[in-house]
Every structure is written in C-alpha cells, then in structure tokens.
Amino acid sequence: MNLFDVYSLFDVTPVKAKGTRIWDDKGQEYLDLYGGHAVISVGHCHPKYVAAITDQLNKIGFYSNSVKNPLQVELAKKIGELSGLEDYSLFLINSGAEANENALKLASFHTGKDRVIAFKGAFHGRTSGAVAVTDNPKYSAPFNAHHNVTFLPLNDIEAVKTELAKGDVAAVIIEGIQGVGGIVIPDDQFLRDLRQATKEAGVVLILDEIQSGYGRSGRFFAHQWAGIKPDIVTMAKGMANGFPIGGVLISPEFEATKGMLGTTFGGNYLAMAAANAVADIFKEENLVANAFEVGEYLKNSIPASPRIKEVRGRGLMIGVEFNEPIAEIRGRLLYEKHIFTGVSGKNMIRLLAPLTLTKADVDIFIKALEDLL
C-alpha cells in the first residue's frame, strides 16, 4: 500500500527536535521558523511536556466521554485564566476543522438559521462546513457546495450590515488574523463594529483563532487587540504543541443540552496531559509576552530591500511579502541556510516560529536572509 499522494514534500526527514531546532536523518541541524505550521508553541520536546504525556500514558491513555475526566476540568480552568474568558464553556475535539464545524453547528442551533457570512481570503478548514466558509474553490468538492454562505470583503462593515438586515444569518465567522490568506489583520475598529452589528442583529460572532490564537499574536487571542468578546472562539494549533486537539470556547448565552455535540476522541487523557502541560508552560515562561517582544524585534529587523514589498503581522505570526515569487529564496533558506519557513501564496514567506523563539534565533535568520537578498 502507498500513501495517498496529496502533499508536496521537501527532501528533509526530521528525526529529532528540541526547542527551536530540528535535526534530520543525516545529522543536519535546522532553525524552525515554521513550527509545524504554527503548532509548536512551547518548543519541540519541552521536558515538562514530554514528562506529562509519558506519565499519563503509564496511568491511562484513553477512555470515552462517558466517564468523568478531571483533566478536562483542569484544562478549562487554565484556559479561562490564560484567556480572561473564565465565564465561557469549553468543548473539546481533535482539530481546528472540527472546532469550526461545531461552532457553526452551535450557531445554527442557537439561532434556528443556516446562512453564514465569511470573508474574502478566509481559510477555516477542509471538512464539509469549514471548507464551505473557506474562500478557495479548489478545496471544495461538489458535495461541499450546497451550504448557504455569503463571502464579503474584509473590513467592509456596511456590506456586513446590509446582509445582516435580511434577517436570515446564523453566524459571522472571521479569523483573528488571516493566515493562508496572507497574514491579513482585520482592522481593530472593524472588529469592534462587527461585534456591535452582530449583537444588535442577534447573530452569532465566531472568531477563528486556530492559527492566530494561543498567544501567537502577542495576545492570548488575536481579537483581543480590538478589545472584543465574541460569542464563540475556536482554537487548536498551539493548544497541545503537536498532540491532536481542538477547542471551542462558548459564551454563557448558549445552553448545553445532552447530545447536541459529541466526540469519541476529543478530550482524551493524553491530549489533556499535553494541553495542561502547555498551559502551565505558557504561564511559567511568559510566552505570550515573549511572542510579542521577539515578534516586534523580528519585524523591525527585516532588512530593507527592493525585493521586499511589505512586512506585516502581530507577535510571531509574520508575513514577509516579496515583489516576486519566493519559491527559490525559500528553498535556499531551507537547503543552504537550514532554516524552515512557511509560505502564503506565491510571494509571501510566512513565519510561525515556536513562541520560545529568542532574539539570537532571529539574528541567525536575518543574517541568512541578508545573504540571500
């Protein structure tokens, strides 16, 4: 049997990782500024993280959600404290796409409606509902094409108000920062206006913080830069440092009923051990503040060059947009300078480093970039 061939792969085989470093099967060391696509939050193989999963596996690895699991309650408390959303409820699943699916379902339950407003450039996942609110037709099969979704220009509050006035909208879903769309940050005032407009219309506001959340932006959630409180927040990538997990934070206005949501693997013992360790490390090592400080240093250190059009982002979610395709320079960063980076579109290098990144790490990247420019 072969693997279903859907991924374009670099010719690198990682076998070991620690902190912000990765080693391949030939012993070559790399600086990781990609974080496995914004997943590695507390650094690779953090000793407290490794110990927590190992210890838990020696006790009990799995049972279903038909029994009490105190680790879930512990995680909810920690996320409430880290996020400032102590009065919200937590529903646990296994991925970001699942988080958005359940958020959309909750919104439809709550309002009795089915239309969703999403935004141009959005990416919310590849499962049925999530891909329906993703603005990229190549990800959507005919099976996914029957959802009632309206795409609007980002930051156009009047267009949103026009659609809300029709009275058939269940939810508006928006990313804290668009990642796949090119590190596009919604205007803070637009988010405040959007919160007010959805509240007045009785429409659920969903903030997709799967990539931009969990400290990556220099706030626990990127929407907190605008000072708003959504009805639902979805999260996943940084929650457990690579162990599959997702979460939905649900405001107190929503009433749970037995069976309305469910999952087999969500909230399992190993995921909870991993996520609780990550939450502890966030607090102990002040990683949200580090993401902001080192992210600002990184943005301000990018060299001026006629080849670079713009640098944008918040915290350690940064896009370096070039005036040309970046495939060559990204490949040279990997194979010559041994630095992992991400991409968005054809012209943008996307930097999604572990939140443990140091200024010394940044200096290594800047020197490499200057050499290649």
For each predicted feature, which ranges?
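Conserved N-terminal phosphate-binding loop of PLP-dependent enzymes in the Aspartate aminotransferase
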Residues: 1-373
